[in-house]
Amino acid sequence: MKPILPDYNSAGVLIIGDVMLDRYWYGPTGRISPEAPVPVVKVENNEERPGGAANVAMNIASLGGHAHIVGLTGEDEPAKVLTETLSALNVKCDFVALPDYPTITKLRVMSRGQQLIRLDFEDKFENTDATPVLSRMDAALPNVKAVIMSDYAKGSLEHVQAYIQKARAANIPVFIDPKGADFERYRGATLLTPNMKEFEDVVGKVKSDQELVEKALALVKEFDFEALLVTRSEHGMTLIRRGQEPFHLPTQAKEVYDVTGAGDTVISVLAASVAAGKSFEEACALANAAAGVVVGKLGTSTLSEIELAEAVHGSQDTDFGVISEKALIEAVKKARARGEKVVMTNGCFDILHAGHVSYLNHAAELGDRLIVAVNTDESVKRLKGPGRPVNPTDRRMAVLAGLGAVDWVVPFSEDTPQRLISEVLPSMLVKGGDYKPEEIAGGKEVIAAGGEVRVLNFEDGCSTSEIINAIKGGKG
């Protein structure tokens, strides 16, 4: 069966926690200072990246999800840099600025791929008022499907219990990247993602997988969690849930250059995947694949939806089902570079029947890759009228993505896919029915780009409307 990535565009996630700015200074070093026995670095360039909870938000945005971040900052230049950088990535920033504190900033001096020193600019947030964060949560919770709390023990989650209770009262799952040995403060959270060291700091040394599972289950019961996901470095990760068998995943990392931010990526992909409708097991598999990618990058890193898809299915296998428009365009570019012919079609596909399957099989035979663009629910309602669609967008796309003939499934919200087709520009555009090529939405653009437009016949005797009427009439 062909695995399916979720539609991350449907994932709204609220992130609360320790936001920070990671700064990097890069340069060569070839001598020792005459002033002290330390290397001299000639700084040639620099870089600034959101870190901590801000890196979590950036990861979700990079996947195509909707990230809303709340955290404590100072009233200073690093706070402005964070806001500008994240806003440019479509992250909604809702920071609480405290004039008596600096924004947490970490400066790393790098040379020849190695970190020589890290300078931290910070004061722990203490005795802060929870009200500003709680009021921001009230505004955000109706628009999200998951909450992440990213704890680096810098004080932004001083009132974490109040935040957990508010989210859980709204029936929103809470995912926490913990810090320290006091798991009592996280009581009632949905899922924690401790690494092996953090886990052993709480339960003591673990000598076997069975002991890990037993101790994890004890924590789940003691602190009223739903699950623990223990990340285990070269041993992969293990999901432990109440009443479920443990779920072990081996590591997917090929090379490890830098683990900075890997935990951020794990919890980002995990929560975004659950918010997009995936089970815990499916979400963990995606998070494990994501971790294998980011540890192969230098510095605090994110990954795109296309990188995640390639990590899950192999760099040469792009048969990954449901995909965002942005990731689709990137995937099509790679397919063209491999000399593959890309075919595209579109439709509502409300109740998939034999006629649809026959049509899609025929379309797939015309090239190497088949894209199916699917009208969203709002688009179908405008085109088909009341009572349609019968099946919502995510279910229609999931069924299509499960067909062997289909490579990519992408939603569009307009009445026609003309704009989407003009962005993708497939080698061939296919449409079923009694059309002239020049009448097909997007056909002119495809032809102008050197592509081809084909009209295929539908199989007689197959109609979604007839199926609906038969069901209403109690037939069949």
Curated annotation (Swiss-Prot):
Q: What residue spans carry the region label Ribokinase?
A: 1-318
**What is one GO cellular-component annotation here?**
cytosol
* Record-linked InterPro entries: Bifunc_HldE, Carboh/pur_kinase_PfkB_CS, Cyt_trans-like, PfkB_dom, RfaE_dom_I, RfaE_dom_II, Ribokinase-like, Rossmann-like_a/b/a_fold
Q: Which CDD domains match?
A: RfaE_like
Q: Where is this region: Cytidylyltransferase?
A: 344-476
- In which domain of life is the source organism classified? Bacteria
Pathway assigned to this chain's UniProt record: Nucleotide-sugar biosynthesis; ADP-L-glycero-beta-D-manno-heptose biosynthesis; ADP-L-glycero-beta-D-manno-heptose from D-glycero-beta-D-manno-heptose 7-phosphate: step 1/4; Nucleotide-sugar biosynthesis; ADP-L-glycero-beta-D-manno-heptose biosynthesis; ADP-L-glycero-beta-D-manno-heptose from D-glycero-beta-D-manno-heptose 7-phosphate: step 3/4; Bacterial outer membrane biogenesis; LPS core biosynthesis
Which BP terms does GO give this entry?
A: ADP-L-glycero-beta-D-manno-heptose biosynthetic process; lipopolysaccharide core region biosynthetic process
**What's its catalytic activity?**
D-glycero-beta-D-manno-heptose 7-phosphate + ATP = D-glycero-beta-D-manno-heptose 1,7-bisphosphate + ADP + H(+); D-glycero-beta-D-manno-heptose 1-phosphate + ATP + H(+) = ADP-D-glycero-beta-D-manno-heptose + diphosphate
Which EC number(s) are documented for this chain?
2.7.1.167, 2.7.7.70
Q: Which residues bind ATP?
A: N195, M196, K197, E198
Give any Pfam family that matches.
PfkB
Q: Which GO terms describe its molecular function?
A: ATP binding; heptose 7-phosphate kinase activity; heptose-1-phosphate adenylyltransferase activity; phosphotransferase activity, alcohol group as acceptor
Kindly identify the residues recorded as the active site.
D264
What HAMAP family does this protein's entry cite? HldE
What job does the chain carry out? Catalyzes the ADP transfer from ATP to D-glycero-beta-D-manno-heptose 1-phosphate, yielding ADP-D-glycero-beta-D-manno-heptose.
Regarding protein family, the annotation reads: In the N-terminal section; belongs to the carbohydrate kinase PfkB family.
Q: How does it assemble?
A: Homodimer.
Q: What is this protein called?
A: Bifunctional protein HldE
Q: Which organism is it from?
A: Vibrio parahaemolyticus serotype O3:K6 (strain RIMD 2210633)
This protein's gene is called: hldE
